[in-house]
């Protein structure tokens, strides 16, 4: 983002905590604010009318929640909530829209992120259709690793099941498979990555395309850059 565009946003930005499960976007409700995530991870989630849900988008320090406003839409049918707690810079929707109106370059810059997220969502659809659960889990853990400082993070089997759109016993079996391959160590509520290259191999090409697109548009996607 250019210094001039950042200067448009800065007076209205406020640092806020992102507790676990905090809703950032509620489906079909006007978006109240945009969150530029600094630490933590948010999930973009699709829901059925009966309440079943699955993660279709994954946002960390590289992105923002409330991106529909960039496309001149004030709401989304998709939910977005915090899956790993952290912090964000929050700006009210009205102030954000005013900044977009004042600077065409700001909108163009943020549309790059929307493009990247579309690529990520497309790859999620591909791996959900073509990869075994263990490979899908490996990809998900790699995406977490890109956005979290350190090699361990707190996550429950139940939450992983929701994110991957599967039953909890399936997640347990997949975690055991990854642990048997010495790729991770799993304890109640915590996963530690032991062999990142091994996870990349198990993801069978499902990981890497969105990350390369992000690098092309913005630079390297790496938790060390936070």
Region locations from a protein language model:
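Conserved phosphate/pyrophosphate-binding and hydrolysis machinery centered on Walker-type P-loop NTPases
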Residues: 30, 127-131, 192
């Amino acid at each position: 983002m250019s210094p001039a565009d950042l200067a448009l946003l800065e007076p209205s930005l406020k640092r806020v905590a992102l507790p676990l499960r905090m809703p950032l976007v509620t489906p079909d409700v006007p978006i109240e604010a945009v969150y530029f995530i600094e630490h933590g991870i948010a999930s973009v989630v699709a829901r059925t009318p009966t309440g079943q849900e699955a993660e279709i988008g994954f946002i960390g320090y590289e992105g923002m929640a409330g991106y529909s406003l960039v496309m001149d839409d004030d709401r989304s049918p998709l939910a977005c909530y915090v899956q790993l707690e952290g912090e964000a810079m929050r700006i009210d929707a009205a102030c954000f829209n005013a900044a977009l109106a004042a600077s065409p370059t700001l909108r163009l810059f943020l549309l790059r992120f929307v493009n990247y997220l579309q690529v990520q969502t497309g790859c999620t659809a591909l791996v959900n259709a073509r990869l075994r659960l263990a490979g899908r889990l490996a990809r998900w853990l790699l995406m977490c690793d890109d956005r979290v400082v350190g090699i361990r993070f707190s996550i429950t089997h139940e939450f992983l099941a929701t994110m991957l759109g599967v039953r909890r016993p399936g997640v347990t079996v997949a975690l055991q498979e990854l642990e048997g391959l010495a790729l991770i160590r799993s304890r109640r509520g915590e996963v530690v990555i032991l062999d990142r290259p091994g996870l990349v191999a198990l993801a069978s090409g499902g990981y890497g395309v969105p990350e390369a697109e992000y690098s092309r548009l913005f630079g390297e996607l790496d938790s060390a850059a936070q």
